[in-house]
Amino acid sequence: MPRAGTVRAMVRSDKGAARLAGVECDLVRGDVTDPESLQAAVAGCNAVVYLVAVIAGRASDFDRVIAQGTRNLLEAARAADVRRWVQMSALGTRRTTKDLVPYFHAKWEAEEAVRASGLPHAILRPSFVFGPDGGLVPRLARIARLAPVIPILGPGTQRLQPIWVDDVAEIVARCASGEQNGLLELGGPDVVSWNELWARLKTALGTRRPDLHLPFWFVRPQAVVLERLPNPPVTRDQLTMLEGDDNVAEPNDALRFGLPLVPLDEQLRRAVAT
């Protein structure tokens, strides 16, 4: 797809800027929780892609960054005559789940703000996004390489539909150009259980460590303690979300774009090769 113009990335700190070293984009400082910092960030932009989120913290943190942050940037975007908006939400976000955990509540409120904004928009709800640099797969790979057993939460029958990060990036770019509108739920080409995901990951790593299923009731009290850490490995809210499925209802909206979506085994091979 031909693309014109320049990508501008808003970062809060030198650390954020360093992570984009070598990426072809302009950098601008800003913080979605500081409305006054956003005017320069969106000035002259045709489209805004909202990727800001937190995955652990207090309810007020989720609201401040995800929900209110979206409102703040929407206000700046409208004032700057931005013509299009792409919102990165999360699969599982629905009216019926908004009171389940603060994360879903904040994501839902952010979606509602976008829907009410009057801007042409696309709201993306991906399943787990897999990639080589950070995120879930490197964490799982470290466990599979180092732990004596593979800790699987619950029965392991909960389903997920991982999608490769480059596929998501292409979909974001196409939505920013106006190819698709509205709500899009995105998954990769394979729907698997957590049991199967771990089995495939072990195959990719060449390890045969045995599985150990940990009931949610057993892990939840430990999560209470872990939540006191600066970057907890798991929280009670995350356990609540992991108890359910995370696959899209058919049809998979990712198929609208005609992309050769990366199969799960290839996703895992790429992610563990780095």
Question: What annotation goes with each model-predicted range?
Answer:
Residues 3, 20, 96-205:
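Oxidoreductase cofactor-interface core, primarily capturing Rossmann-like NAD(P)-dependent enzymes
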Residues 6-8, 47, 53-54, 68-127:
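Conserved Rossmann-fold NAD(P)-dependent oxidoreductase catalytic core, especially the SDR/UDP-sugar
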Residues 13-14, 190:
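Residues in the short beta-alpha loop(s) of Rossmann-like NAD(P)-binding domains
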Residues 15-21, 25-72, 76-78, 91-99:
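NAD(P)H-binding glycine-rich loop region in Rossmannoid oxidoreductase-like domains
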Residues 33, 65, 160-166, 192, ...:
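Residue-level signal for the nucleotide or nucleotide-sugar donor/cofactor binding architecture
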Residues 35, 39, 45, 71-74, ...:
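Short, amphipathic alpha-helical "lid/cap" segments that border enzyme active or binding sites
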Residues 136-162, 203, 208-246:
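Alpha-helical membrane-targeting segments
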Residues 171-234, 248-274:
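Mid/C-terminal beta-alpha module of Rossmann-like enzyme folds, strongest
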